[in-house]
Amino acid sequence: MNCVVIPAYRAAGSILSVIEAVGPEIELIVVVDDGCPEGTGVVVANRCSDPRVVTLMHDANQGVGGAFLTGMRYAIVRGADIIIKVDADGQMDPAQVPALIHPIASGQADYVKGDRFFFLTNSASMPPVRRFGNLALSFLAKLSSGYWTIMDPTNGFFAIHARVAELLDDERIAKRFFFETDLLFHLGLIRAKVVEFPMRASYGNEVSNLRVSHQLGPFLAGHMRNTTRRILYRYFFRDLSLASLQLVAGGVLFLFGLVFGLYHWWAAPPDQLVPTGTIMIAALTFLMGFQLVLSFLNYDISASPREPLHPFLKGWQAKAADEGRNAAASYVAPERVRREA
């Protein structure tokens, strides 16, 4: 079963048209009203007659990530196989869902996300501030997630296999604007295969709830934290390889050469030349360290997951899936559930 989850906040004017555009390949549509002051969930419950639609209500706003994770958990207990996130503002075309989920349905990927940078004309139509921010965040996301071929990390149009979703520690995933990027980091920890889907986004008159000045600090802090956690977990806790030694030795030599060279350059009298031996020590250690760090990065880039994970999870998760389906009828959550035809 395929399920679409639509986090909804201040989307009362667009949500019905988004639901109407969802094709017949989707058996379940979960709309999560994330404490919307416009009552988007009430609008859906009272005015939408689509029998596939279920509305979940958050009493308080939890962010786009919190809303999706609520819908994801509900979809899993309902027995969904593939879970798709579609935003409620109409920026994403639900008609593209069949192409989006094809790599997962055919066993080629665990997670598929949209890429708005694939088409140059579409990228040029992106607002300049948004384009620059996404390009900068793309590089940081490569470093923090380990998916070096992935662009557009903040794209919210994605699909994930339910078996892989069950492996995620959703309590530790960021709930607000860092959600999509943090999700990539957690997918990297379990070595899920991620591929991109070329898409065209529509930038209309919708008003973004993102305030760049407020989120810049949390985004940078989140990337630094995730980069540190990923490297420690991947190269020191889970495994110890030549790349681990390259990183340690390279980091030590690089920093030693840099600090040693700067110190002697600063401390040298202006009328005296720095001894050749001192220059050689600083230069050689700096260059050796730099080369070792480059070797580590080359290994890290080549180590991106290449095999999908979910085909290997079918056996040991079968029992859990049966229990989930049995629990669907008595699903209890801190959110109110409303369904009206």
Across the structure, where does each feature detected by a protein language model lie?
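Cell-envelope/extracellular polymer assembly enzymes that use nucleotide-activated donors
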Residues: 2-3, 182
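Short hydrophobic beta-strand elements that form part
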Residues: 3-7, 30, 57
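Short, well-formed alpha-helical segments that are part of the catalytic scaffolds
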Residues: 6-24
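Acidic helix N-cap motif at the loop->helix transition within catalytic regions
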Residues: 13-17, 38-47
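A conserved acidic beta->alpha catalytic loop
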Residues: 33-42, 60, 90
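Acceptor/aglycone-binding surface of glycosyltransferases and processive sugar-polymer synthases
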Residues: 54, 58-77, 82, 94-177, ...
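Hydrophobic helical membrane-anchoring modules
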Residues: 173-174, 178-341
